[in-house]
Each structure stands twice: as C-alpha cells, then as structure tokens.
A protein has these predicted regions:
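Alpha-helical transmembrane segments of integral membrane proteins, especially early/N-terminal helices
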Residues: 1-19, 48-55
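Extracellular/lumenal glycan-associated surfaces
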Residues: 300-303, 309, 398-400, 407
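Extended non-catalytic domains of envelope/secretory-pathway proteins
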Residues: 215, 227, 273-283, 294-308, ...
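Non-transmembrane, membrane-proximal soluble domains of secreted or membrane proteins
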Residues: 15-39, 61-266
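Sequence/structural segment immediately N-terminal to covalent heme-attachment motifs in c-type
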Residues: 260-290, 302, 341, 361-386, ...
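Short, structured interface segments
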Residues: 241-258, 340-358
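Axial heme c-ligation environment in periplasmic c-type cytochrome domains
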Residues: 236, 290-297, 313-344, 350-353, ...
Length: 457
C-alpha cells in the first residue's frame, strides 16, 4: 500500500514540477516553430506513457498485493497482450519520428535566396566572415592562418579580397532574411548554438558544416558552444545581434575587408615614441613600470593587447567602474590619442621596448601556484607564460607580480571584465572565479600564482 502511494505521489509531483518549473525553452526568434512542434509531440507521447505506466504500476502494486490465501498465477506467455503492446509502441515511435523527418528535410534544404556567412570556432572564441560586394566568400585553408590572417583566407583568391572580417565574438544579422551559416573549426570539435534559433550544428576540423534559419525578432542573443572543447569550454561565449536592415547595413559598413587588413600601413614607431613621452612619467622611459604610482610594466606586452586596452580606456570599457580609481586615471591619458593610427603607433612602440623582467615583490608557495596555473591558465597563456594572439591571452612572465594580483582581484570582484564590450574580460572573470582555492585566503592563492610566474624571468 505504501509503495503504491509513493508511486502515485511521484507521478503527480513530476507533472506539477514540469508545468510549474521555470526551466523551459527560451522564446523562439526564428522561423523554426516546427522544431518546437516536434519536441512537443515527443514530450506529450513520452509524458503520457510515463503517467499511464506508473499509474498502472501503482494500481497493480495495490490490487495484487500479497494477501493470505492468495497465490500468484504463472502465465509464461500472452500473445494478445504482446501484440497490443508491440502495435501501440510502434505507433508511438512512428508518431515521434515521422514529424522529425519532415523537419529534417526542411533543415537540409537551404533556400536559394539565403545569404551566406562564415563562423570560425576555435579555443575559446568566435570569429565571423561575411561576403563582400561580390556576394561570394573567398576560399580559406589552415595553411594560411596567421596573426594577420586568422581566418586563413587564400590571398590568391580574388573573391576573398572584399570579404568582411569580424575578428571578435559578436556578429550581426538583418531581420526577416534567410541566412546560411558555414561552420569551420580551427582546432577541435565545437558546436554553434543560439538557443533562440532552435538550430545547432557541430563544427568539425577539416570540414565545413552548415545550418540555416531566418531571424524574426530583433535583439541580442547568446552564442554558445555545446560541444566539450577543453578547459575553456564554459567561457566560449559570443553574441548575435538581429538588426533592422538599416542598422545592419551601418554595422557591416564599419567593418574592414580582408584586403584592408592586409594593406594596413606599418605603424610609425617614431610617432609612437613621441606620444609615449607623456606615459613615461608614470610607466618609465623603458616601460619598466612604477609600483609607487600603480603604473604597471608595459615592456614585453604584445602590441595587439596594448592596443585593445588603450581602446578600452578610450571608450569607457575600462576605467568607469566604481572602485577602479587607477583605471579612471587612464581614461584621460588614453583619450590623448586622437585616432586609431595614434593608438597603433603607441602600441607598436611600447611592444618594441626591451623586455627587462620586473623584480619580484611577492613571495608565495611556488608549487601550489604552478598547480593552479596549470589547471586554469596554461591553456590560454601557455606553459611558458608568454601568451599568444591565438587565444588573445597576453604575456604574464616577467611582468609585475603586484599588478597581476591586483587585476585578478578586480576580475573576481567585477571591477574589471563585466562590460558588454569586453568579451575577453568576461572570460577572465569566469576563469578568475573558477580558480580552485585550497584555502579560504584568496589573496594567498593569487600570490602563489604570482610567485610561480616569477620563476621564469
């Protein structure tokens, strides 16, 4: 009797939990309502089977419970019952699978008017490419991939010269027009997913997979990787913005073509040196930094990282958060650089300065720091702690240990990295938070990592 009541309560509780639960699909913003329909059919069929089977089980437990003088009847076969069960099961399976076949046929049949764009997935970032005025994407291959050509576009293919490249994890699409996403992976298995679109597809190295959809609602939606791709899988986030046609045209016009990125003039180091004179008062003539002024060492950092941080200070991505008083002082300094060329010149000059390792100021448990670094940081910043453009991770070895500790604290507390225009900072917030502490003293943990970083000078 008790078991029958428990089974009955389990059924009622499961049904209530499902309908009262806040965990359900996001609102759909594409034309793929049919996918939701197929899922609903599967839910109702399996849900009905779950309820009926368990209620029948509860009934049997109660009805045929052991009683004095009752003896179970042995019936090895019941052909009539087996036939009915087989028939009902067959109908149920067909009812679940058949609609999916029709939806799949639509999924693999891309409309002729669909516009193509390319998604490049790599650990742990998203980049995007759009066809230029000719409406065609140029060919690409991994042999051409470099810091200046992260998509591996074939420089000999004229169709690729006007391709619009977006080396950032945010893409835009116009509303109401079908689009076909060509999916490439630069390293391991990834998966391109926007939950609100209802479609997803694996990205396999060496292959070009695809999916298509038609955006129906303007807004900003998360891009997720739903294929385990390494330690940074959980921070592989991006965004797709569905625009009006006017807003989309303005956005796409602001992005460079592949030809423009390859023809960019070399930075003027002399001009950068002249501009750096103001910075030298805090950061030192050789970029060696000054802890007394909370000015970190700059020499040794990559030019692309310096350029990004200067632009972040100029645009308010950094230095505007409450509690970031030192970052706030950099806002005015960065805005002395009048345009992108000035920022590039300054960044290139700083990157050209001799890299003299900073003197250690922090002591810590090097073995513990090495363990924490290897588990959390090495995948992006590399074993030698010199960083790489591939993962947009700056150099850490030979830099100021006190500044490293300060910035990890800032990431953990949300002072840095939470601005919507700082996707790599957002990744660092997640990684800094996820660094496994073996004790309750977070500062000691950071100092241990800093001490380990100091072992390579």
């Amino acid at each position: 009797m008790i078991l029958a009541v428990v089974i009955f309560a389990l059924v009622i509780g499961s049904v209530i939990f499902h309908f009262a639960s806040p965990w359900w699909f996001t609102d759909i913003v594409s034309q793929w309502d049919s996918i939701d329909g197929v899922i609903s059919i599967t839910f109702w069929i399996t849900g009905a089977v779950f309820v009926l089977c368990n209620l029948f089980l509860a009934y049997c437990v109660y009805k045929f419970r052991q009683k004095p003088g009752h003896k179970a009847v042995y019936e090895p076969e019941n052909h009539k019952l087996e036939s009915w069960l087989s028939a009902i099961t067959t109908v149920g399976v067909i009812a679940m699978l058949a609609p999916g076949l029709f939806v799949w046929a639509d999924f693999v049949t891309v409309p002729e008017e669909a516009t193509e764009y390319e998604v490049m997935g790599q650990q742990w970032q998203w980049n995007f490419r759009y066809p230029g005025a000719d409406g065609k994407l140029g060919t690409a291959d991994t042999e051409f991939i470099s810091e200046l050509n992260p998509f591996g576009i074939n420089p000999e293919d004229p169709n690729g010269m006007d391709d619009i490249v977006v080396n950032a994890p945010e893409m835009h699409l116009p509303i109401g027009k079908p689009v076909k996403a060509l999916l490439r992976s630069n390293d391991v298995l990834h998966n391109y997913t926007v939950p609100q679109f209802r479609v997803k597809m694996d990205m396999v190295p060496g292959l070009v997979s695809y999916l298509w959809f038609q955006p129906e609602v303007t807004g900003r939606y998360d891009i997720l990787c739903e294929e385990l791709c390494g330690i940074g899988h959980f921070i592989m986030r991006g965004a797709v913005v569905i625009d009006t046609q006017e807003d989309y045209d303005a956005w796409i016009a602001s992005k460079p073509t592949f030809a423009e990125t390859q023809a960019m003039a070399a930075p003027d180091l002399a001009a950068g040196q002249a501009q750096y004179a103001v910075c030298a008062s805090c950061h030192g003539a050789g970029g060696e930094g000054n802890q007394a002024l909370n000015a970190p060492k700059l020499s040794g950092l990559q030019d692309w990282y310096i350029e990004r941080q200067l632009n972040h200070f100029k645009t308010g991505v950094r230095g505007q958060t409450e509690g970031d008083q030192y970052g706030a002082s950099m806002v005015g300094m960065a805005n002395m650089l009048v345009d992108d060329t000035a920022v590039r010149n300054m960044s290139a000059y700083i990157a050209s300065l001799p890299d003299v390792p900073a003197q250690p100021t922090i002591q810590g448990d090097i073995a513990n720091g090495a363990d924490i670094y290897d588990r959390n940081c090495a995948a992006c910043h590399l074993d030698k702690r010199n960083g790489t453009w591939y993962t947009d991770a700056p150099k850490l070895s030979g830099m100021n240990d006190w500044y490293f500790v300060t910035q990890i604290k800032n990431f953990r507390s949300g002072i840095r990295g939470l601005h919507a225009a700082d996707p790599y900072g957002e990744q660092m917030v997640s990684m800094a938070t996820a660094m496994a502490a073996k004790n309750t003293d977070d500062t000691k943990e950071m100092e241990d990592v800093a001490a380990y970083l100091n072992t390579i000078r």
